[in-house]
Each structure stands twice: as C-alpha cells, then as structure tokens.
C-alpha cells in the first residue's frame, strides 16, 4: 500500500475512515450530542441519510459532525475560491531612466509610474549611467528627487535611492487608501 498523498491528507476523514473508538458528536442541527462511540455516531449518520465527517482530528476525542459531505466540500471550495479572488497579487514594475532623460519622456514615464501606483503595484526606478556620466551622479539624484516630489501624493518611498554599480535604484510603493 502506498503512502497517502498530500491531497488525501488534506481531506477530512468520513464514515468508516474514522478509526478512533470515541468521538465528540455534533448532530445535524449543530448541537453537541456529547462523547459517543464511533459506531453509534455512524449509526446516527446513517439514520439521517448523511455522512459522519471528522471536523477536528487533533482534538481529544476528535470532533465529528453529521452532514452532507458533498455539500461540505462544495462550500469549502467556494470559500477558497472567494479567498483567492480577494487576494491582490502585488507586482513590482520597473521604470528605467537616464540622467539625460528629456522632459517629454519624463512626463510619459511619470504618467506610467502614477498608473502603476494607482493599480496597487510597487515601482522600482532604475537610473542607469553610461561612460563618463558616472562623474555627474548629482544629475541622477536630481531626477530621483523630482520623481519623489511629483509622486508625493500617491506614493511613499519604500527604498531610498542607493547606488548599485553603474545605476541608482529607488523603490516606490502606493500609499494606503481607505
């Protein structure tokens, strides 16, 4: 016999899969019926035409409930789908600048930057120096400071400008809106 897969371990045990001698039983209406033998609990589930489902296997004794297992799985999958739908995947977008970026290009990139922030994404700003431009890093810092000032109402600086090799990096994240 092979070892149970992770998927089988995640599923609740039902009916004859419950091997413990005693369980704490919750009936169809959600009322506690107390601690009964597993055999009695199975009989009660059969009489009501439903399944005996182990809700809390780690409790002493395990908690079991009489319910429709198919409906239980359906409700569980609906809850998980709803939780996944509500989760927002935060992405990090990257915008590349140069110390010689002209004003028209700057405005286009600024518009994109604000759009990314309004969508809830973080933005990594990379300012790349070439050749002798490294001697004038203050030009790059001015651009980053200007970006910071222009986005002050929609963004906060998550990572201040720092130098990595031939580039300056800064990360902006959207302000929390409530």
From Swiss-Prot:
The compartments listed are:
Cytoplasm
The subunit field of the Swiss-Prot or TrEMBL record says: Monomer.
Write the record's keywords in alphabetical order, separated by commas.
Cytoplasm, Initiation factor, Protein biosynthesis
What is the phylogenetic placement of the source species in the record? Bacteria, Pseudomonadati, Pseudomonadota, Gammaproteobacteria, Legionellales
InterPro entries membership: T_IF-3_C_sf, T_IF-3_N_sf, Translation_initiation_fac3_CS, Translation_initiation_fac_3, Translation_initiation_fac_3_C, Translation_initiation_fac_3_N
Write out the similarity annotation. Belongs to the IF-3 family.
Give the UniProt record's GO annotations in the biological process aspect. ribosome disassembly
Q: Does the keyword tRNA processing apply?
A: no
Is Lyase one of the keywords? Answer: no
* Role summary: IF-3 binds to the 30S ribosomal subunit and shifts the equilibrium between 70S ribosomes and their 50S and 30S subunits in favor of the free subunits, thus enhancing the availability of 30S subunits on which protein synthesis initiation begins.
Question: Can you name this protein?
Answer: Translation initiation factor IF-3
- What domain of life does the UniProt record list for this protein's source? Bacteria
Question: One GO molecular-function annotation for this sequence?
Answer: ribosome binding
Pfam families, alphabetized: IF3_C (PF00707), IF3_N (PF05198)
Primary site of residence: cytoplasm
The UniProt entry's GO CC annotations, sorted and at most eight, read: cytosol; membrane
Quote the HAMAP family the UniProt record gives: IF_3
């Amino acid at each position: 016999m092979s070892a149970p897969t992770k998927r089988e371990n995640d599923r609740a045990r039902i009916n004859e899969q419950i091997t413990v001698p005693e369980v704490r039983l919750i009936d169809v209406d959600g009322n506690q019926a107390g601690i009964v033998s597993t055999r009695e609990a199975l009989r009660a589930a059969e009489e009501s035409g439903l399944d005996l489902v182990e809700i809390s296997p780690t409790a002493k004794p395990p908690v079991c409930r009489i319910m429709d297992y198919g409906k239980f799985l359906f409700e569980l999958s609906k809850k998980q789908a709803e939780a996944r739908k509500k989760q927002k995947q935060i992405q990090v977008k990257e915008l590349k600048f140069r110390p010689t970026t002209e004003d028209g290009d700057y405005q286009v990139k600024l518009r994109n930057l604000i759009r990314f922030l309004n969508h809830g994404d973080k933005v990594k700003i990379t300012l790349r120096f070439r050749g002798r431009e490294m001697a004038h890093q203050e030009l790059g810092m001015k651009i980053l400071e200007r970006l910071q000032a222009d986005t002050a109402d929609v963004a906060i600086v998550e990572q201040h400008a720092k130098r990595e090799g031939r580039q300056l990096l800064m990360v902006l994240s959207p302000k929390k809106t409530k």
